Design a protein with these regions (language model features):
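Active-site-surrounding "flap" and adjacent substrate/cofactor-binding loops of secreted or lumenal enzymes
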Residues: 65-71
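Conserved catalytic core of Hanks-type protein kinase domains
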Residues: 20, 71, 329
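N-terminal capping segment at the start of a domain
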Residues: 19-26
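An alpha-helical repeat/solenoid feature that recognizes helix-turn-helix modules
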Residues: 1-12, 28-61, 74-116, 120-190, ...
Length: 368
């Protein structure tokens, strides 16, 4: 694919996003009420626009970034607005990444506040969790610090850790320059490995399930989009691996400092390259799950591009076909949209920010 075709698509996407930026710098959805406050979409759009090299686009990204410190207070707290943060971990993690990319005292101070907010939502001993708990070390969708429920009580399902939120939390720590020996990384590995269809001991691997891929969450079949894969030879119910979560898992492993040549990283990378598809979200999806499979197509593209680039996978295997497919799917005017509605990629701001972010990585990896 000619470079100018990708550049034209990226410029068109940036222009479309800029046309939908509010005067205060934020992006707000016209599709979903949960995205109308600005906190959910703004850090995602800012990170996408920061990949551009156009001065006007970078200026708009800075205006969007200026919206984020307004929620950070000098005492280290976050004031999210009248309705709270819809997606606290994603907002905080993407805010940290954007503010650290911009740098400078103003942005760094706000990034530190957002990072503190993020760390308060990791499941740690301070919140009653211990390494004997399978949830220990992960991040979920809790609106407040996710304290361990008292005996006999049930945890809020939204607070339970998942692989996507955990990957974002870990990458924010890296973006903020936290060293690899920071205990947050070790705690997170405890959770990440539990979502990996992989056995450290080759003798204990079940080839029907231990394929090197990842799943989203522990013990929750409906939220694992590929569903239950079956029962292994030890009698355990196993979840099927699928694309977006395997990309998330690979990002998490690398953020935790595992080497590219390590066994877990290699297994996850091989799963992605062996099953890679630019046209569809790959994985062993069970019957009746085609809508869920399609619902995170643009997130799959975004996470896979980040994961494969970070892992050093050969660009020819994925970057060129992914770029071609994304350019083909772009709508007149510069946006993208997913027909599947289950995870709100039918909101064009969501889909466009994800697609353009993936396309930028493809562009930087290809040699013309």
């Amino acid at each position: 694919m000619p470079a100018h075709d990708i550049d034209r698509a990226l410029a068109s996407a940036a222009g479309w996003l800029l046309d939908r930026q509010a005067p205060d710098g934020a992006w707000r959805s016209e599709t979903y009420g949960v995205f109308k406050e600005g906190d959910a979409l703004t850090p995602l759009a800012v990170n996408t626009l920061l990949d551009c090299d156009d001065e006007a686009v970078i200026g708009a990204a800075r205006l969007g970034a200026d919206y984020l410190p307004e929620m950070a207070r000098a005492d280290g707290s976050i004031v999210p607005g009248p309705h709270g943060l819809a997606y606290p971990v994603y907002t905080a993690a993407l805010a940290v990444r954007a503010l650290c990319r911009l740098g400078g005292p103003k942005y760094r101070g706000a990034a530190d506040t957002w990072l503190s907010f993020l760390l308060q939502r990791q499941m740690t001993g301070d919140l009653g969790w211990s390494p004997s708990d399978r949830e220990y070390g992960g991040w979920g969708y809790a609106h407040g610090p996710p304290r361990k429920p008292a005996a006999g009580q049930t945890a809020d399902p939204a607070a339970l850790p998942n692989l996507s939120a955990t990957a974002f939390g870990l990458e924010a720590l890296r973006a903020a320059g936290r060293p690899g020996d920071n205990p947050a990384f070790g705690r997170a590995m405890h959770f990440v490995c539990k979502c990996h269809n992989f056995a450290d001991d080759p003798a204990g691997r079940d080839p029907a399930f231990d394929d090197g891929g990842f799943f989203f969450i522990l013990g929750d079949p409906p939220r694992n989009k590929a569903g239950v894969g079956g029962t292994d030879r030890r009698g355990r119910e196993r979840f099927a691996s699928y694309g977006s979560t395997t990309a998330d898992g690979l990002r998490a492993l690398l953020a935790c400092g595992l080497p590219r040549e390590g066994a877990r990283v290699t297994a996850a990378r091989h799963w992605l390259t062996d099953t890679f598809s630019a046209a569809a979200h790959p994985g062993r999806f069970g019957p009746g799950r085609s809508a869920l499979q399609a619902s995170v197509y643009f997130y799959w593209c975004w996470s896979a591009a980040h994961a494969l680039a970070a892992a050093g996978a050969g660009d020819v295997l994925w970057a060129e076909p992914l770029a071609e497919e994304l350019v083909r799917r772009q709508r007149r005017g510069g946006s993208w949209v997913n027909d599947a509605v289950e995870v709100r990629e039918d909101d064009p701001i969501v889909a466009t920010a994800l697609a353009a972010g993936a396309l930028s990585i493809c562009r930087s990896g290809l040699r013309f």
